[in-house]
Amino acid sequence: MIDTKTAIAVLGNVTLDIICNSVDDVPRHDSISFQEAAVTPGGCGSNTAIGLSREGEKVYLVACTGDDLSADLLHQTWEKIGIDTSFTKRFTDQGSGVSVGLVDSDFQPRFIHTAGANKYLRPESVQPEKLKEQGVGFFHVAGYFVLPGLLNAGFEQKLSLLQEKDIFVSLDVVTSPAMEKPEHLWPLLPFLNLFLCNLREAEILTGHGDPESASGVLHQKGATAVVIKLGSKGCWLSEKGLGKLIPAPLVNNVIDTTGAGDAFAAGLLAALRKGENLDEACRTGIYLASKTVQYLGAVNIS
């Protein structure tokens, strides 16, 4: 049985985000202007960890950065917010990940990205024994498909060891060309308590554009519980083949959807850690996501 009086560890990509709003077109040879910008920590791992810390959770971040000015800003922010980085490694010969997000007039971001030190995040970065010693009861993988070091054999063994220690394991993918060949994902599904993706990702992975059919394929592949994020429509929750739509409230002041999925994951995990069931946890995730889309950038660190 999972002990809910525990910490949460987040493994995932971390970047310095530069978000530009709004940019609808990028001519090849011309300069362009935009209205506003935000420079913040980013990446699925950092976003989710910050969201959890904002909810009052004890959070360990399992990540890799370079040893540069970008990393200094990231670490300073994490320390200020209260995230434990004892499982985060700095590499002196490598730059940190950086993402430039171009948010269009429909509030949708496009990213120019360099992975930097994120490529060094590998199965051996997961230390089940040490995580358990630190009181970790929940382990979340954020941005799986943009972590090339995890797209190989061996990661499922680490997830299995986490579950053997009664640690709740969840995994959230992120849109990436690597999704076109999902064979690395399938062996992981039986070792997850919860699998998350959005509808576009679900269609790429399963070939089905409706959440019920997509969930069915994911269950056949070994997933126990599936949450498919549906943006402004809420999410689809499927447990043991029984699915239902959990609607989202209307949000009038949408500015930028960057990081909404990570905010959803943070709210969901925080609620599960407090002992709520998956239905209740999804509603908490939707609430946090609805707040995130009302400001520029994935996180609000003010």
Task: Go through each PLM region and give its residues.
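Glycine-rich phosphate/adenosyl-contacting loop at the front of the ribokinase-like
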Residues: 1-64, 69-83
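Ribokinase/PfkB-type carbohydrate-kinase core domain
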Residues: 1-14, 77-90, 103-194, 199-245
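Conserved phosphate-binding/catalytic region of the ribokinase-like
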Residues: 2-9, 34, 161, 211-302
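Short, glycine/acidic-enriched loop or turn micro-motifs at the edges of active sites
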Residues: 16, 20, 67, 175, ...
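Generic secondary-structure signature for well-ordered alpha-helical cores
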Residues: 16, 20, 54, 83, ...
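Short, conserved phosphate/pyrophosphate- and ester-handling motifs at nucleotide-, phospho-/glycolipid
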Residues: 52, 198, 261
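Short, glycine-/polar-rich solvent-exposed loops and beta-turns at beta-strand/coil boundaries
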Residues: 92-94
